[in-house]
Swiss-Prot record:
Substrate binds at N11, N78, G88, N89, N163, N199, E220, R221, G230, T231. The keyword Cytoplasm applies. GO terms for cellular component: cytosol. The keyword Nucleotide-binding does not apply. The gene is dapF. It comes from Mycobacteroides abscessus (strain ATCC 19977 / DSM 44196 / CCUG 20993 / CIP 104536 / JCM 13569 / NCTC 13031 / TMC 1543 / L948) (Mycobacterium abscessus). It catalyses: (2S,6S)-2,6-diaminopimelate = meso-2,6-diaminopimelate. Pathway: Amino-acid biosynthesis; L-lysine biosynthesis via DAP pathway; DL-2,6-diaminopimelate from LL-2,6-diaminopimelate: step 1/1. One of its GO terms (biological process) is lysine biosynthetic process via diaminopimelate. It is found in: Cytoplasm. This is Diaminopimelate epimerase. Homodimer. Belongs to the diaminopimelate epimerase family. Its EC number is 5.1.1.7.
Length: 295
């Protein structure tokens, strides 16, 4: 089976073109693929298919609201094999892949996800890199909570961007303190507020100046710390705006993997950032057949 390796601000993925759902992406298969010692290594897997094929293949039980059977469907799996509703960095890489291999000839089209339709605009692209804007949909705030990250307690906003987030703005946190924080360690959070788990973002307060700029690190549900999280940057941008008494505006978010720009409006939110497709290859049938025996 062919694959492409790509990343969006160093949030990396194995892209599998499997339009007709010929492979079973079992938990074991995804875990093995994403393992950085015995597999290709990635934060997640992006299967390329369509809504119609996903319905026929049993990947989707029902059609997500607002999409058509002909729309591309991003079947996204976390590194632990769990199914995720949405991944903003993944959508950029997914859209770039479609354009680069000729499966899509438009610069503006819809990528469907379990969280619903995500319209994308490819601002520029080459076989290697792309600049992509994703309409991430409305940001929904549904409360406040706390998390313990790296032994430190943080307060934040509970935010839905198609998946759950706790975005914690710390007014006294310096960029150096953020840099050395142990974000990779298991986090503690309110399981009643987040019964299905949560992505936790820790960020500095917005800097003064014409551009609201923050620094962020993230512990992703089902993965651990990643170099970037697209939906997490949107949640962080919204929390940063709320911190300065706003609900709309633009925020530049710096993550360990690079920088993205988030715009929050009254109706939606937009994530603009890079994508890179760095390698193509083929996974042998023998490897697929031996997944269960991999040590």
């Amino acid at each position: 089976m062919k694959f492409t390796k790509g990343h969006g601000t160093q949030n990396d993925f194995v892209v599998l073109p499997d339009v007709h759902i010929k492979r079973d992406l079992s938990v074991a298969a995804v875990q093995a693929l994403c393992d950085r010692q015995r597999g290709l290594g990635a934060d997640g897997v992006l299967r390329v298919t369509t809504v119609g094929a996903a319905l026929e293949g049993g990947v989707l039980a029902e059609k997500p609201a607002g999409v058509s059977s002909e729309d591309w469907f991003m079947d996204y799996r976390n590194a632990d094999g769990s199914i995720a509703e949405m991944c903003g960095n993944g959508v950029r890489v997914f859209a770039h892949y479609l354009r680069s291999v000729g499966l899509e000839h438009r610069d503006e089209f819809v990528v469907a996800s379990l969280a619903g339709p995500r319209p994308v605009r490819i601002n520029s692209w080459s076989q290697l890199t792309a600049d992509v804007t994703v309409d991430m949909g409305p940001v929904k705030e549904f409360g406040a909570g706390e998390a313990i990250v790296g032994g430190r307690r943080f307060s934040g906003l509970a935010i839905d961007v198609g998946n759950p987030h706790l975005a914690c703005v710390d007014a006294v946190l310096t960029t150096e303190q953020l840099r050395i924080l142990d974000v990779g360690a298991p986090v503690t959070f309110d399981e009643q507020l987040f019964p299905d788990g949560v992505n936790v973002e820790v960020l500095t307060a917005p800097s003064a100046g014409p551009a609201n700029t923050v620094h962020m690190r993230v512990h992703e549900r089902g993965v651990g710390e990643t170099r970037s999280c697209g939906t997490g940057t949107v949640a962080a941008a919204y929390a940063a705006l709320r911190h300065i008494g706003q609900r709309t505006g633009e925020v530049v978010v710096n993550i360990p993997g690079g920088q993205v720009r988030v715009t929050v409006t009254g109706e939606s939110s937009f994530l603009r950032g890079p994508s890179m497709l760095l390698a193509d290859g083929e996974i042998s049938d023998e490897w697929w057949g031996g997944i269960g025996a991999c040590g």
